[in-house]
Amino acid sequence: MDSSKEALKERKKMAKDEKKRQKLEKFLAKKTLEIGVSKPRKEYRKEGYDPLQVEGKWYKLWEEQGLFKPVEGGARYVVPIPPPNVTGSLHIGHAMMVSIQDAVCRYKRMCGYEVLYIPGTDHAGIATQNVVSKQLAREGIVVDREGFLKKAWEWKDRHGSRIYEQLKRLGTSVDFGRERFTLDPGMSRAVADAFVKLYEKGLIYREPKIVNWCSRLLTTISDLEVNHEEVMPNTYLQVDGGKYEFGVIYHFKYPITADKGFSGDHLSLPTIEVATTRPETILGDTAVCVNGRDCRFSPEGIKEMLGDVPHGCRIYGVNPLTRDVIPVIFDDYADMSFGTGVVKITPAHDANDFEVSKRHGLPCKVVFDEQNRVVVEGEFKGLKRFEARKAVVSKLRDVGLFVSKKGHPQVIPRCSRSDDVIEPIIKSQWWLNCKEMARKAIEAVEDGRISILPEGAEKQWYKWLGNIRDWCLSRQLWWGHRVPAYKAPSGKWYVGRTKEDAFLKMRSECMGSDCDLSELEQDEDVLDTWFSSGLWPFATLGWPEETEDFLKYYPNTLLETGSDILFFWVARMVMLGLELTGKVPFSQVLLHGIVRDAHGRKMSKSLGNVIDPIFVIDGCSLEKLISTMRSGNLDEREVKRAEAVLRQDFPNGISRCGADALRFALLSYTSGMKDINLDVLRVEGYRRFCNKIWNAHKFVKTMVDELAGKNGNGPVCKDDYGKYIVSSAELPGPSEEGPVEWILRRRNETVEEIRRTLDSFNFMGATQAIHQFFIYDLCDVFIEVVKKSKNEKYIRVLFRVFIDSMKMLHPFMPFITEEVFSNYFNGSISVSPYPETDGSEHESKFSVTLQITRHIRAKAESNGWSKAVVEIAPGGDVNHADLRFIRSLCRKIVELKIISDAEDGPYEKVGGSRVLVRQTE
């Protein structure tokens, strides 16, 4: 290869390398390659940074010093933690959530804000009852309600404390003096008060309606807790203890007559063809629906089907299974383009049919009980619903009314908690009318009282709230807030904050009649978990009482949470906050995406890819990962699948990385609402970053120790306790020294960039900025210059810039930065002022020197030269004084020649100079 082609190749490589440094994703990809995916798990060498030794001591000291309690003086900044469920331990998704929140809180605290970061946990009604029930079943224990609640509280105490320990290990700077649990007495009072107030406003009411029934959990669930699974034609699903076919549409004949009192042989009647995906519900049909524009049911069409009947005569269907005579009704609900254009109406087991029944005054006939067994008298009684389906189809075949069975794409509603196929049933429940509250919540975003980030999320907000339905509050569970409603012997319900409160209301209506407190029976149901969670921003501060905390810290400032619960939780907090307090609960909503595994799969215990963040912090063997998974509530089939995933993804276990590396890795991924494919092994790259910080600290400490020893009472000296005192002269003024001016300019640029990105919640940009500054500018360049020169001015600048780097890193890496800071100063870095730009214009020509340096490095590395000879003809902004820095930064240079004329020969122009790099002979 000739020299010009070689030079072109090298220039392209340099440009590519520079581009990589400016783009985070490419940088992270490079780091992933450095880590590798099949290296065995390694422990730290004794001389390296050991996160466990450092991280283990600091949280207790922070708490003892009360550093996370709000300190008056600055503007208030309040962040409520989305309370984790007490169903188990925190997972990596929680770790990302608290890493984001804590980075914001620590940053704001250092900027002088009065920060309150509120911790707590959620009782998680359905989820906790489910895991406790599984545990009891596995142990063969049968309990009543009181016994179950005792077991559930034991579970909460065990796992709630585990969650708080995990939060501490992650360095979360919450004020544990204000921690709350959603079933605490104070929270329970708030829930009862909210229910009563909403009831008295006419927003809560009790009514029989179609609900989503889960027969495995034996409770209703909300629309948001239903997953709508699209299945292809003729798909078999495991449900109700067997495998059943879905994705099928059945056509059958419905006998019709003009005789309302028909009681003869229905098989001799004319028929119309009906299509359904649920033939088992024919047992509950109370009407047949056709479209009024369907010409088949015009007077002429009816005459053609039924013969000579009086004009305007009503026609009826005869249920092919029960022989009940039911009306044929006309409604636009019947879609003439779908199926046969004729729809059977089963109001008790279909939400749309239920609405049709209300319009036409149809009765509701229940087909299934709460265990999905047929309750209709006759040959099908007692069959489970999908067994009944097969029996019904067989019966229709036998009597000649079956037409066909065709594959058809279908959407199956499944419980997000149990995976059961939801059965719509009618139940009398407590409902919250959300329409007007939703309108107010929309207005709060439209007028700017609440901002939702990242941009674009508002569209989802408007769409969902604009189509909101009433909220079913009742849940058929034992674990949760009992509905504060009490039933009298008359059947009337009385709502009160307490039983005594409800009794007073009942007695006021007794009109002198005898009535007794014991006659009132509290509703057995509990409230939807999201109702109590919806009060979180203000109930945690003492509402409904006007406590000092409530008056001072409400509304909150920032609500940071996952985008997947925008409607489950965030919308309900806004609706309830506006309705009950008259104020928005917070001014900003920040949403993040879902954390998935390295393969892009959603994390699931049954898949074996849910990782406890403590396993990443402390390290974990494959054996422990498997044993921990086996100790859960998975069945044997799920255990086998999960174990296979663990063996594939973590053949050598997980290396010890520390909390700082985990936090930094999670934050470096975070960009808006995009889902994150987290490769746990990539955290190891940031563990090595911690080691780089530690080694830099050891060098800086050596340098400033020497400087302090020389200066006595100089600009950097020690107090009587061995801590450093830095005078106002710590930073030299403008100087002709290239490296000093250059590093101060880069320091200012980095401070400005991190402040900008953190203020806009761009954690990816913030972590990229400090990582690149620390590695490529401070360590790779300035520390190398200081090593060679040991110039006092350089050391003082190094000290200041290094400490500022620790402060910039602190919101992301609280432990190692606190450890480093404590080696130099009294007090905590967490309450030290965040760096600001110094206001000086630091102009430096040193960047040209670095250009030449990088060219020399790239040339030597690309050719595999361990030693090189360099010839430079200085020009442009480079003079002979700059050349000493080039030598100190390029260790591969064994000879550096300064020449005056480089017009001839294979010299390349770099930064105004002519440069030749060649291998030593």
UniProtKB/Swiss-Prot annotation:
Sorted UniProt keywords: Aminoacyl-tRNA synthetase, ATP-binding, Cytoplasm, Ligase, Nucleotide-binding, Protein biosynthesis
UniProt-annotated location(s): Cytoplasm
Keyword Ligase found: yes
GO molecular function terms listed in the Swiss-Prot or TrEMBL record: aminoacyl-tRNA deacylase activity; ATP binding; valine-tRNA ligase activity
Entry GO CC: cytosol
Biological process according to GO: valyl-tRNA aminoacylation
PROSITE patterns xref list: AA_TRNA_LIGASE_I
Pfam families assigned to the protein according to its UniProt record, in alphabetical order: Anticodon_1 (PF08264), tRNA-synt_1 (PF00133)
Motif 'KMSKS' region: chain residues: 602-606
Annotated signal peptide: none
Principal subcellular localisation of the protein: cytoplasm
Residues given in the record as ATP binding sites: K605
Keyword Endoplasmic reticulum: no
Motif ('HIGH' region): 84-94
EC number of this enzyme: 6.1.1.9
Region spans: Disordered: 1-20
Catalysed conversion reaction: tRNA(Val) + L-valine + ATP = L-valyl-tRNA(Val) + AMP + diphosphate
Entry-linked NCBIfam families: PRK05729.1, valS
Homology family: Belongs to the class-I aminoacyl-tRNA synthetase family.
Protein name: Probable valine--tRNA ligase, cytoplasmic
Taxonomic source organism: Encephalitozoon cuniculi (strain GB-M1) (Microsporidian parasite)
